[in-house]
């Protein structure tokens, strides 16, 4: 058998073996059999030493052509095997596009966030500026700048989280008011609300939390009167609780305001007739307020004979509890999805 016949037979056998290889492993074995260092094609190259010199170039060219042919067939077969494997995998993992998709849970705004944003939008519409402040505050701005010197007995009204002797977690957002007035350097007007978290050493129960949200408001200008405060609070009550709400002012005491009042709104559930929400009084307490104490104005650099003002503070937690019928303030902070899911329907309806 001549060398040409041997190469032709080898080529035919290689093509048969390649076509019979059904996976990558079998194809690799065929490649080693023919093109490996000890393979059939490599053996042909070794025979070249026995040929006359004038025949070696032509023989070497034919062997290389055979190698290229086998390699080309191997590449094509490998490509085909990959395609068959992919098609089989796709067939096994067929997705029925007619089936309904998996339900994806969509969140909604927290009831406290909704309430705070509603209050902020209300006061923005009245021309107020929203001002943020520090939650870790100096004792001076938390107490002394608000007419509460170190010896003042009213400090006992608020148990505080002290970090050092002069640094504490703020017990109200009033320090933001003091700092804002100080920055204005005695020049009015000042018209701000201060939303934020506050901290007090209360034992957590259905109506108390060591951390809660507060929004305080401050207006300072010339000729600000108690009637301005009352008119503002009436508008706020009607916007938050309904147009038919009424308010009443009860005398109270706050060191930073004089006079000071507690503000009640007529019960929106019983219309003032008496029920469990208002404890059968017909009224619900919603905030504290008063005219800014002259000492507070003076300490902030305002002339109390020229300027006057009013301040108020409300708890969005309590307002949200009243609006949504929530009986335990702790529900706001436990992140219970079952509780929060109830407010999706409210948001979908676009209700406040």
Swiss-Prot record:
CDD domains: PheRS_alpha_core. The keyword Transport does not apply. It catalyses: tRNA(Phe) + L-phenylalanine + ATP = L-phenylalanyl-tRNA(Phe) + AMP + diphosphate + H(+). Mg(2+) binds at residue 258. Keywords: Aminoacyl-tRNA synthetase, ATP-binding, Cytoplasm, Ligase, Magnesium, Metal-binding, Nucleotide-binding, Protein biosynthesis. Pfam families: Phe_tRNA-synt_N, tRNA-synt_2d. The keyword Ligase applies. Tetramer of two alpha and two beta subunits. This is Phenylalanine--tRNA ligase alpha subunit. It comes from Staphylococcus epidermidis (strain ATCC 35984 / DSM 28319 / BCRC 17069 / CCUG 31568 / BM 3577 / RP62A). The gene is pheS.
